Curated annotation (Swiss-Prot):
The lineage of its organism: Bacteria, Pseudomonadati, Pseudomonadota, Alphaproteobacteria, Hyphomicrobiales. Ferredoxins are iron-sulfur proteins that transfer electrons in a wide variety of metabolic reactions. This is Putative ferredoxin-3. The keyword Iron-sulfur applies. [4Fe-4S] cluster 2 binds at C80, C83, C86, C90. Residues 17-46, 70-100 form the 4Fe-4S ferredoxin-type domain. It comes from the Bacteria. GO terms for biological process: nitrogen fixation. Keywords: 4Fe-4S, Electron transport, Iron, Iron-sulfur, Metal-binding, Nitrogen fixation, Plasmid, Repeat, Transport. Binds 2 [4Fe-4S] clusters.
């Protein structure tokens, strides 16, 4: 079932839900996190082999010495409301969004 909504000006709009962030493209800038009111994604550390180590909270992370870089990771996809704010601010276009009827449970 596809959900369509009508905006105030009468045009239709269909939510596109965040399902993934490309770890090879993401630069970990955090812009998407800042505009997301639902805390769908968080900053994670990644090592040189590409393994995601865990969430970075800015405190004393156990793996701080192992970090090669940081990336955004979808931690709570079910919280996404499909507004697309994260996609609009992403400088690398590294996110995948899909309509509700395309999401496999």
């Amino acid at each position: 079932m596809t959900s369509h909504f009508v905006t105030r000006d009468g045009s239709t709009w269909m939510p596109q839900y965040l399902t993934a962030i490309d770890a090879m493209t993401c630069i970990g800038c955090g812009r998407c996190f800042k505009v997301c009111s639902r805390e769908v994604m968080h900053l994670h550390g990644i090592d040189e082999s590409g393994e995601i180590l865990g969430a970075c909270d800015g405190e004393d992370d156990d793996f701080a010495g192992e970090l090669s870089r940081t990336i955004m990771v979808v931690d709570h996809a079910g919280r996404c409301i499909g507004c697309g704010a994260c996609a609009r601010v992403c400088p690398k276009n590294c996110q995948t969004h899909v309509a509700a009827d395309e999401i496999v449970a």
